[in-house]
Amino acid sequence: LIATVKRELLVRHLEAWAPAALHRARRVIYAHGYADAQSGASAEAAARVLAEQTDFVRGRELTMLLVGDDVTPVADRLAGIPELALLSMHAVSGGTEERFGVALKAASAQRVPLLGFLDAASASEPPSPATVAALTAGKPAEVLLALAPGVSAEAYRAGWPLFTAVELATGDEPGELLAFGTTSGKSLEGFKEALWAVDEFAGVRYRDPADPDRHLIDISLSPHPGPLRREILAHLGRVGSATVTELRTFALTETIYRAADATRVLHTLADSGAVTRRPPHGRLGGDVVISLP
């Protein structure tokens, strides 16, 4: 079930990323690490999304890198799918940890739109920070990274101006961690929209790694605000006061929620007297200062 949620998130993100990247640049690269995991199911899903972009591709170069322990069977299978005939694919075996950075260099992935997907949740070891950081050579650059339960995403933040993580959980025990790093604020907003728009799969819920109460949240277009409320109050306890704009940015970058969710929570907190606002009346605009009473 968690694999299905990850795959749907990847597909949704690719559907938004690929046309925008092809509109921006003549060369675009998508790099899929651990591509032989789960018999290449997520690699095939990604390839099908990219192949649908052939309308955009005329006169442009869209390349998919498949990197893993032994990706030849996956690459051969994908090569036999007629719909994928126009997609340029390069398969690199020998291990994601060992070959990912090398494959990016060989594909001249510097200063071109670059998205990497690394599902290391079932790998024997998580990728090194250097392997993930190799993607920052792109411009703009993005990464979707899945980690096994209990593995922290903190070591991977370096090099990414914007970085967020969400736990995919089925119960009280720690779940897989899905991290997203990007150089684009607009892309982070798009990822958050996709996060809450995926189909609700029975038993799979989100947990915000920053929520001290480890509250499980149903996947919904209107997510339960409890964890965000706690995180905003804790943040205000640390910083003293912040503008609405700063708190919207905090929600977007430091929690699993969207900026719009923060606006709704701030209205509720202000109306209940849990926070004070300056000025005390009028619209809750971006420059209104929020603090604890």
Regions found by a protein language model. Name each.
Residues A46-L50, P73-A85, T131, S152-Y156:
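Short, aromatic/basic amphipathic alpha-helical patches
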